[in-house]
């Protein structure tokens, strides 16, 4: 359903995966895990295809710019390098991706949500605080707030935090504290902690952690949230 594309916007070269619905719809930026967009352990392209089936124009930017990992050690190095050394480029890729989606002829209305998983969940929180005027809703999945500053006081868009009870990477209490700060802004905030599951429970390519029942429920809630705020 989708395809890889490359474009240049505002002097920034971007590559990524786009999936479009038959009749058009609002946009969703889908942010990859620490594996990278092209990793065999990533299901981000499949998630974009599923969003398209639900009536969204989904675009997954490649924030690693062609690099990817197939083991935790290399994935950790890529993620750490991105957050420590490349955030200016990450910001530029994100802004270019938002412009790309809003200019896409399939995107109608011209609203854009953002979701992501693992380090992509972190970026979904980060972008909601850094660029609240560029997006209309955010759904971070098990993001790691400890690896970059999340400007919770500046989050002004509806946001839905999805967490795993037994997540060994994420301090759920820290994410809930962020949610409380956002709530004080008068923003619609939701938090869902899925019991009995761990990090990456939505990734069907990770048989060691995938939970089909809770993954489907989280997916349904995500689609409903975006339909509420993007359509």
Swiss-Prot record:
Signal peptide (residue range): none
SUPFAM superfamilies: alpha/beta-Hydrolases (SSF53474)
InterPro entries documented for this protein: AB_hydrolase_fold, Dienelactn_hydro, Dienelactone_hydrolase-like
GO-annotated molecular function: hydrolase activity
Short name of any one Pfam family annotated for the protein: DLH
Designated name of the protein: Protein usf
Species of the source: Aquifex pyrophilus
Encoding gene per record: usf
């Amino acid at each position: 359903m989708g395809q890889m594309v490359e474009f240049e916007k505002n002097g920034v070269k971007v590559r990524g995966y786009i999936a479009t619905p038959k009749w058009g719809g609002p946009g969703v930026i889908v942010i990859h895990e620490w594996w990278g967009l092209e990793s065999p352990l990533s299901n981000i392209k499949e998630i974009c295809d599923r969003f398209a089936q639900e009536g969204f124009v989904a675009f997954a930017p490649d924030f690693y710019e062609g690099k990817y990992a197939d083991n935790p050690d290399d994935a950790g190095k890529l993620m750490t390098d991105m957050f420590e050394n490349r955030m200016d480029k990450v910001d530029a890729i994100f802004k270019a991706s938002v412009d790309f989606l809003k200019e896409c002829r399939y995107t109608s209305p011209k609203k854009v949500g953002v979701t992501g998983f693992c380090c992509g969940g972190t970026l979904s929180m980060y972008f909601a605080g850094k660029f609240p005027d560029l997006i209309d809703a955010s759904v971070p999945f098990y993001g790691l707030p400890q690896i970059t500053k999340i400007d919770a006081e500046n989050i002004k868009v509806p946001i839905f935090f999805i967490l795993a009870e037994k997540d060994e990477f994420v301090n759920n209490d820290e994410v809930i504290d962020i949610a409380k700060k956002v709530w004080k802004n008068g923003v619609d905030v939701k938090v869902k902690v899925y019991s009995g599951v761990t990090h990456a429970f939505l990734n069907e390519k990770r048989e060691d952690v995938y939970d089909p029942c809770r993954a489907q429920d989280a997916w349904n809630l995500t689609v409903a949230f975006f339909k509420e705020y993007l359509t």
